[in-house]
């Protein structure tokens, strides 16, 4: 399909760009999207949670009371799990939560969420731009010109390559994220409701 290209003033340039139907008009696969989001979040987990078990704790191993005759419950040493301050039974251990998906599945997940955003009218293609210096106001002006209400929308800007001035200009705005095509993932697309794609990024995205 063809879509209009806008400039940073929010005006149509009179030019159009083709967004491939194979990327922006596919039938969403909810289960694949779920798997890819789960993979992304699982891979971010540190997995360093650890609690000491009975054999790892210091302290006397002396039995606290005799086995029979006290009238109370049986107790072992001071590290017994049944006592306050004792060891934990089956506590967490360091582990790797990450898992992998096939490339085709990850591509399908990205296509699914891109198609959803396109169907909702949340995709805008803007001609390439940059800022001379990092200024939050310039980025807010850009959003205003594109009729994007930052207060009510979450925005993802997709760059062809890293641009520090654009990144720094948007960093102080809580509902705005900036990424590059090479780092684009399903979770980030799903987490926002508006996408601003720079013109030079379209070719790479069409190859998803």
Curated annotation (Swiss-Prot):
Protein name, UniProt field: Large ribosomal subunit protein uL4
Cellular component, GO annotation: ribonucleoprotein complex; ribosome
Subunit details: Part of the 50S ribosomal subunit.
UniProt region (Disordered), positions on chain: 45-78
GO molecular function: rRNA binding; structural constituent of ribosome
One BP term from GO: translation
Organism encoding this protein: Azobacteroides pseudotrichonymphae genomovar. CFP2
UniProt xrefs under Pfam families: Ribosomal_L4 (PF00573)
Entry keywords, A to Z: Ribonucleoprotein, Ribosomal protein, RNA-binding, rRNA-binding
Coiled coil region boundaries: none
InterPro entries linked: Ribosomal_uL4, Ribosomal_uL4-like, Ribosomal_uL4_dom_sf
């Amino acid at each position: 399909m063809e879509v209009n290209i806008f400039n940073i003033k929010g005006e149509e340039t009179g030019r159009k760009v083709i967004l491939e139907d194979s990327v922006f008009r596919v039938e969403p696969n909810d289960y694949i999207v779920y798997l890819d989001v789960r993979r992304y979040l699982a891979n971010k987990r540190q997995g360093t949670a650890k609690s000491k078990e009975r054999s790892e704790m210091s302290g006397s191993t002396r039995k606290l009371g005799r086995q029979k005759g006290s009238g109370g419950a049986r107790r072992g040493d001071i590290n017994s799990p049944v006592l306050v301050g004792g060891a934990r039974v089956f506590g967490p251990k360091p582990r790797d939560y990450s898992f992998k998906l096939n490339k085709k599945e990850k591509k399908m997940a990205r296509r699914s969420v891109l198609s959803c955003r396109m169907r909702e009218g949340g995709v805008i293609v803007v001609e390439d731009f940059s800022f001379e210096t990092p200024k939050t106001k310039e980025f807010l002006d850009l959003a205003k010109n594109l009729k994007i209400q930052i207060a009510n929308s979450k925005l993802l800007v997709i760059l062809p390559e890293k641009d520090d001035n654009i990144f720094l200009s948007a960093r102080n705005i809580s509902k705005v994220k900036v990424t590059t095509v090479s780092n684009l993932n399903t979770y980030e697309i799903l987490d926002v409701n508006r996408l601003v794609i720079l013109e030079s990024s379209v070719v790479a995205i069409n190859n998803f």
